[in-house]
Amino acid sequence: MDFVGKRFWFFIISLLVITPGIIFLILAPGLNPGIDFTGGSSMTLRFSNESNINQEQVRDQLFALSYEEATVQNLGENSFFVRTRELDEVAKDALVTNITSSLDEGAENVLQGFDLVSPIVAQETVMNAFWAIIAAAIGIFIYIWWAFRNVPSPLRYGLAAIVALIHDTIIVIGIFAILGELMNMEVNTMFLIALLTVIGYSVNDTIVVFDKIRENVLIHSNRAFPEIVNLSISETISRSLNTSFTLLITLVALILFGGATIREFLFVLLIGVAAGAYSSVAIASQVLVSWDQKSIGIPFRNRTVT
């Protein structure tokens, strides 16, 4: 298959996937921040087995108590994870008492866990996450630049990997902006952990292809660079797709049968793994070819490779 000759269409597909997310980020409320970023309280409530309480009942009770901003997640087995504004001890005890008396009177030890995140801590979390992502990107760039020092223009390998990384990150953030609007998904600490995991996975996929390109550059020094890239993609695509497909199946199973508390983490991984598998073939490698042909800004200037 002529992967290199179709790079313009790969760029168009990426643009079509990224654009809706950008629109939601700009025109809609954007990302839906959790209490890890805004500050607030979270609690886990567990009612008696005989109560048969559902998520709507808990949400309605919170609304009746003037906690309209609260969100509720069903953890199964009559357990619920509640996020709301910042509560002091008095407000927390009053809230739990009112919910218990209304939904499961007489139940004991309903409150299973309580966490408080102040706005200052939330702000520090945002900044720490930002610097962690920047540090990861710089580290990845330096490593790839050094690892590919034996091939011509090793700098472009590092920059191409960063382009793919940015591509995958934008896709994840954009889709999460849409999911936040449609499914009330929050951006929290688990989101950031998953995003850093996606960055590592994306780079791993890219390095597999780049390493094969490096090997073929040394073996087939008499062949044009686009031909070498095409050959390298053909030799690695089966491995990349099989690995990604296996991981995607596992993630789908966890989303369907796993707990709600790691829902955001799993969705980020699901989106990121798919984006990473695509970008290693359709973005990172094609940026290398476009750079080699000095046609990064001229995507229509394709070269068919057989």
Range-by-range predicted roles:
Residues M1-T306:
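A structural signal for conserved, well-ordered secondary-structure elements
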